[in-house]
Design a protein with these regions (language model features):
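Alpha-helical protein-protein interaction scaffolds
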Residues: 1-62
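TPR/TPR-like (Sel1-like) alpha-helical repeat modules
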Residues: 1-13, 86-90, 117-123
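Boundary/linker segments of alpha-helical solenoid repeat arrays
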Residues: 8-20, 90-99, 110-112
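Structural detector for internal amphipathic alpha-helices that build alpha-solenoid repeat scaffolds
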Residues: 31-39, 63-73, 95-106
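Amphipathic alpha-helical scaffolding segments comprising HEAT/armadillo-like alpha-solenoid repeats
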Residues: 44-53, 75-87, 109-116
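Structural recognition of alpha-solenoid helical scaffolds
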Residues: 47, 62-65, 74-81, 95, ...
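Short coil turns that connect the paired helices of HEAT/ARM alpha-solenoid repeats
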Residues: 55-58, 88-92
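Charged, low-complexity intrinsically disordered regulatory/assembly segments
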Residues: 121-218
């Protein structure tokens, strides 16, 4: 209504500033109301779908969509359900890592036991770092950043691969491998993509290719 009055120039000049403030307030109230309604819709959807067994029956891409919905709401009421999904080995490693990252971002305190690739680790999201904040990831990234400083195209591609692999493997890093050896194997991995084949550490390359396969979300 106020906007219509402005458009039709029915508000006196001396009153326009006051009415503009009212108009802005009304817009904020409407926006907040829409946001609350949106959050309620998401919460209703999540309560319906986020049973572990039902979740496992969904295609991975649909699971990913549901996980993205979680980023828009307070996930503390769902922390026990999320814990169960993260600890379920049948849930895709990438999905489990994303759920864990959401708990970290919202600083949710709960003890979780994660097993991947024959390794197991207990952690509390409220006290944990995100995948790309882990020390060995940073070391490998810095080595490769220096090496590909003059080749931004390859470096951009490598950054994307590195971050995807770090998320899928999370909360595990490259132990027992040394960061320099991992970085060198990533260089060889990139060279193979361009048709250049060299000798490499088979165990590290196997891990890289496994992570690459898992990143396809099939």
């Amino acid at each position: 209504i106020i906007e219509t009055l402005f458009n039709e120039q029915m508000i006196p000049i001396e009153q326009q500033e006051k009415f503009q403030r009212i108009q802005e307030l009304n817009k904020r109230i409407a926006l907040n109301k829409q946001q609350l309604e949106h959050e309620k819709q998401i919460e209703s959807l999540l309560k319906e779908q986020m049973d572990v067994n039902r979740f496992l029956n969904l295609p991975v891409m649909e699971q990913l969509i549901l996980v993205q919905q979680f980023s828009e709401v307070n996930i503390r009421p769902y922390k026990n359900m999320l814990k169960g999904m993260i600890e379920e080995d049948e849930v895709h490693p990438f999905i489990r890592s994303l759920l864990l990252s959401l708990l970290i971002e919202q600083e949710v305190s709960i003890e979780i036991s994660v097993s991947k690739f024959g390794m197991e680790k207990k952690l509390n999201p409220a006290e944990s770092k995100l995948p790309t904040e882990l020390p060995q990831y940073q070391e490998i990234r810095n080595i490769l950043a220096e090496r590909y400083d003059q080749n931004p195209t390859v470096w951009e591609m490598l950054q994307e691969v590195l971050s995807k692999h770090a998320i899928i493997a999370y909360p595990f890093e490259w132990t027992p491998f040394h960061s320099v050896d991992v970085a060198n194997t990533y260089v060889q991995y990139v060279n193979e993509m361009f048709g250049q084949f060299e000798e490499h550490d088979c165990d590290i390359m196997k891990r890289i290719k496994l992570l690459d396969h898992l990143s396809e979300l099939q």
